[in-house]
Amino acid sequence: MKKGYIFILLTAIFYSTQEISGKMLAQKGAMDPFQVMMIVFLIGAIILLPMAVKDIKVKKLKLTGNDLGYLALCGILAVSISMSMLQFAVTYTKASTAAVLFCTNAVFTIPFAYFILKEKIKGITIVSIIVSLIGVVIIFNPAKVMEGIGGSRDLIGICFALVAAVVWSLYTVISKKRIEIYGGYVFNCISFFFGVIALLILLVVTGRPIFSGITLNNILVLLYMGIFIKAVGYICYLGAIKETSAVTASTVFLIKPALATVLAILILGESIEVNVVIGIVFIIIGSIINYSSNKKANDLKKVANTSSAES
């Protein structure tokens, strides 16, 4: 169990630096957001490849055209759209704001799960959605937007972050259908490659740079994002699930809003406005309510399974 909590801490640290690393690249201004995600996920996919190949052999998986189409859809949603939108978000707004808003993906997952997976929505879940959305509105600060204070860049960045969160939640729900069949390494490795291919096509068609713009100043950040955030971070997350449980491991996403904000202040020197702090608190409370509900349901399921096994 102690090993599991170490995995949770490492995952939280790696995942909390996603937007900060992206912001560092955005500040240098030499690379296109789509280009950044193509390179980063290509690195991550290559690192996960040996483990994916091993799992395919062990599980004797035979991927059909239907499987590849499904994995391609997941890759396009997660890599080509969601993560690219998140990179655009940090180009326009603060890394801390983008990180916190992206963490609301758990809230948007609930309605998608209801319509796609036919999962029931409990009253406490609705409460968590409302509390989290209040946090989003506070961060938006409608009064400030109406007055035109602070310019439009922040608002554009916030919109990109919310699009990233919504698309990621859709990806999360769709991935639930088959991820257990393939296993985490196979699922992510292949979907990463499909996402990279889609981005490569986009870059070529639109005449955007593919590898130009990479310098000694930004290559280390790209390598860090690809190796530690996309590959090692996910390996640690799977380790956390294995050593604890899926529900316990999900505390990573309770830690991220606060940790990402602190790291953005320390590393990027960002200043955080009062409304953002209040919004973060609401989003964390909403996440805690949702986590507590899931944990209770998981505990009841374990008790039910134990009782049926004993009888």
UniProtKB/Swiss-Prot annotation:
Chief localization class?
membrane
User: Which keywords does this chain's UniProt record carry?
Assistant: Cell membrane, Membrane, Repeat, Transmembrane, Transmembrane helix, Transport
Keyword Ion transport carried by entry: no
Database matches in InterPro entries: AA-Vitamin_Transporters, EamA_dom
EamA domain location: 12-141, 166-292
Q: Would the keyword Membrane turn up in this protein's UniProt record?
A: yes
Q: Which domain of life is it from?
A: Bacteria
What is the name of the protein in this document? Uncharacterized transporter CKL_3017
What is the source species?
Clostridium kluyveri (strain ATCC 8527 / DSM 555 / NBRC 12016 / NCIMB 10680 / K1)
Q: What is the lineage of its organism?
A: Bacteria, Bacillati, Bacillota, Clostridia, Eubacteriales
